[in-house]
Amino acid sequence: MNPEQFQTALAEKGIELSDTQLKQFHDYFEMLVEWNEKMNLTAITDEKEVYLKHFYDSISAAFYVDFTKFDTICDVGAGAGFPSLPIKICFPHLEVSIVDSLKKRMTFLDALAEKLGLTDVHFYHDRAETFGQNKAHREKYDLVTARAVARMSVLSELCMPLVKKGGSFLVMKAAQAEQELQTAEKAIKLFGGKVEEHFAFSLPVEESERNIYVITKTKETPNKYPRKPGTPNKLPIE
């Protein structure tokens, strides 16, 4: 998917990109490839692949969920900024917070935000487990996103505490998502969530499977969650 095809594909879904936004995506791609030579940000560096598997894939959530109704987003384990920064470029009104445990990624994201002229973006170098116990962030976000960083039961413990009551947790997964959901149902319920919607679709060009789950926060997460760093991964609630 080259930049022109990317622009057309988004327009077909109702997302019209301005010249400024197209330039932001171009600069994002160039910077990602340039910095990737110094640090491991992504295995995907071919332009067509980046536009499809990073940019388009990140924005695909907006084909099913109305991002104009959210003000604050927290992205857990965003790595090189996916999915939240491509979404931010398309929906500039959003205030985006990214949490990642690797300091070097924060350095990249800081430089990227400056280069792209992004405002209302905040980067936190922290473990999700610690961040979720921080009163300044706990139950403060309209929407929390995670893109395939861990199993759904683990993600629920890391992300649900950050979602405000009435807000949403958006999980983006590739294949075998239904199986993961079944093992995560207990955790989702325990942390105050309810699976509201599931969207299954294929990524264009390569036709690979994608799944998006929207989990609504119906009640507060018990105070003891998330547990201390490393525990959710070692002893997932299933």
From Swiss-Prot:
Keywords linked to the UniProt accession: Cytoplasm, Methyltransferase, rRNA processing, S-adenosyl-L-methionine, Transferase
> A single GO molecular function, which one?
rRNA (guanine-N7-)-methyltransferase activity
Any idea which positions bind S-adenosyl-L-methionine? Answer: 77, 82, 128-129, 147
| Any Pfam family the entry gives | GidB
Q: Which cell locations does it reside in? A: Cytoplasm
Q: What EC number is given for this enzyme?
A: 2.1.1.-
Q: Looking at the UniProt record for this protein, which Gene Ontology cellular component terms does it annotate, in alphabetical order?
A: cytosol
Question: So which domain of life are we looking at?
Answer: Bacteria
Coiled-coil zones: none
Where this protein primarily resides, as one coarse class? cytoplasm
The family database entries (PANTHER family) matched by this protein are listed as: S-ADENOSYL-L-METHIONINE-DEPENDENT METHYLTRANSFERASES SUPERFAMILY PROTEIN (PTHR31760:SF0)
Q: What does this protein do?
A: Specifically methylates the N7 position of guanine in position 535 of 16S rRNA.
Q: Which family does it belong to?
A: Belongs to the methyltransferase superfamily. RNA methyltransferase RsmG family.
Q: What is this protein called?
A: Ribosomal RNA small subunit methyltransferase G
Give the originating organism: Listeria monocytogenes serotype 4b (strain F2365)
